[in-house]
């Protein structure tokens, strides 16, 4: 199976031949991931508010004062400040630290998955967009076109330099991802948002038509299970909206790691 993102599945969990150099690279990639997570926090906060993600520099959302350079160290600044602004002592959500750690861990996983190849940078782009889109959709129930356009453009660039699939597969992935959710949106009379449709279409560009089907299946199953749990616990009612973007993002990262394995097992069972 040819995918847009080349995968080296054996690199994810194989630590039997780990060297000191490998450990150093893991730490270094983890630090880079923390910094990327800090940038993603900026994107997640500012993009829905139509603010520049570059200027001005980071500031406290309570008092508006610019954050000191020493307090911009990802994750550790939140720990040292005990989760409060240095100036006004307003609480800072632990989610900032969570996103930084999440990005750091997934960056290391991507590095292992790609065995340090150039495809690592494509994987970093992927998780950056997935995390940003997932949290923005969770907060605002919106997936912004400008983010999706950038995501699609990067998918095309990745395919140009690293891809192992045809442009036809990318086009079919685009049609399959967007078409399936568009059909669901029509049949469910608005049960799916337009942003989700476009998100699935762009994922199809990155993954191709076979993997986007797996992504949609996992996202629907996971979304259904979470929905049942929320209904059972009284956290949501049948009339409440649950954003689908986070489920698509999680499913996409899962298939990025294990898509080849899943399809290989399926083909072995189906065709002997």
Predicted regions and their residues:
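C-terminal ends of transmembrane helices
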Residues: 41-46, 82-90, 130-140, 182-191, ...
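Alpha-helical membrane-inserting segments
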Residues: 40, 44, 106, 110, ...
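Membrane-proximal soluble regions of multi-pass membrane proteins
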Residues: 42-95
């Amino acid at each position: 199976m040819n995918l847009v993102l080349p995968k080296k599945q054996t690199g994810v969990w194989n630590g039997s031949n780990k060297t000191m150099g490998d450990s150093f690279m893991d730490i270094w990639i983890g630090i880079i991931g923390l910094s990327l997570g800090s940038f993603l926090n900026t994107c997640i906060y500012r993009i829905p508010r139509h603010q520049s993600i570059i200027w001005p520099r980071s500031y406290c959302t309570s008092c508006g004062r610019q954050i000191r350079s020493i307090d911009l160290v990802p994750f550790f600044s939140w720990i040292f400040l005990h989760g409060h602004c240095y100036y006004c002592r307003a609480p800072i959500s632990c989610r900032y630290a969570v996103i930084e750690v999440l990005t750091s861990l997934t960056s290391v996983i991507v590095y292992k998955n790609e065995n340090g190849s150039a495809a690592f940078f494509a994987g970093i782009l992927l998780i950056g967009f997935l995390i940003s889109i997932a949290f923005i959709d969770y907060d605002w129930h919106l997936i912004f076109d400008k983010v999706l356009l950038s995501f699609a453009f990067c998918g095309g660039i990745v395919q140009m330099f690293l891809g192992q699939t045809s442009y036809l597969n990318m086009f079919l992935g685009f049609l399959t991802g967007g078409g399936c959710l568009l059909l669901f949106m029509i049949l469910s009379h608005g049960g799916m948002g337009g942003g989700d449709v476009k998100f699935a279409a762009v994922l199809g560009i990155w993954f191709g038509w076979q993997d986007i089907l797996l992504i949609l299946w996992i996202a629907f199953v996971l979304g259904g299970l979470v929905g049942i749990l929320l209904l059972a616990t009284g956290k949501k009612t049948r009339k409440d909206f649950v954003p689908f973007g986070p489920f698509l993002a999680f499913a996409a990262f899962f298939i990025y790691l294990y898509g080849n394995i899943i399809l290989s097992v399926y083909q072995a069972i189906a065709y002997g």
